[in-house]
């Protein structure tokens, strides 16, 4: 017999034995053994995760016929009859504004960033945005290409 003390109370615990084996071992023979479930694993090829996103090329030069392209898209989105001052058309309707900017982004390959969307109030603002050329050079590239004083040098390998 074994004695066990639980929080100050002494109880006697009997270990049942059936034909020389403890109770747990006796009844375990009658339990059905569960077969291990085998889960099929499907290997998917995943692209490697980049630590930082690749630099995107942002170079943009406005085309020569930008004004005529913009005018044709404005006619397509706002209707064929345009006033003489078509550049002063308001872009308050967000659906029309989206359609116009989406057509221009597809055609020119240059998208208006989210931070500048609220500044596009009139067609003139869109024309001014697309008239600005963007170079794909960093400030360090510009500094190394410019004429530097003799005491200033940019060394890329350090």
UniProtKB/Swiss-Prot annotation:
Q: Which GO terms describe its biological process?
A: mitochondrial translation
Instruction: Report the subcellular localization.
Output: Mitochondrion
Looking at the keywords, is Flavoprotein present? no
Query: Which Pfam families does the record cross-reference, listed alphabetically?
Result: Ribosomal_L50
InterPro entries noted in UniProt: Ribosomal_m50
Q: Which UniProt keywords apply?
A: Mitochondrion, Ribonucleoprotein, Ribosomal protein
Q: List the disulfide bonds.
A: none
Asked if the keyword Membrane belongs to this entry, the reply reads no
Recorded GO CC terms:
cytosol; mitochondrial inner membrane; mitochondrial large ribosomal subunit; mitochondrion
Annotated family: Belongs to the mitochondrion-specific ribosomal protein mL50 family.
What subunit structure does UniProt give?
Component of the mitochondrial large ribosomal subunit (mt-LSU). Mature mammalian 55S mitochondrial ribosomes consist of a small (28S) and a large (39S) subunit. The 28S small subunit contains a 12S ribosomal RNA (12S mt-rRNA) and 30 different proteins. The 39S large subunit contains a 16S rRNA (16S mt-rRNA), a copy of mitochondrial valine transfer RNA (mt-tRNA(Val)), which plays an integral structural role, and 52 different proteins.
Q: What is this protein called?
A: Large ribosomal subunit protein mL50
Q: Which gene encodes it?
A: MRPL50
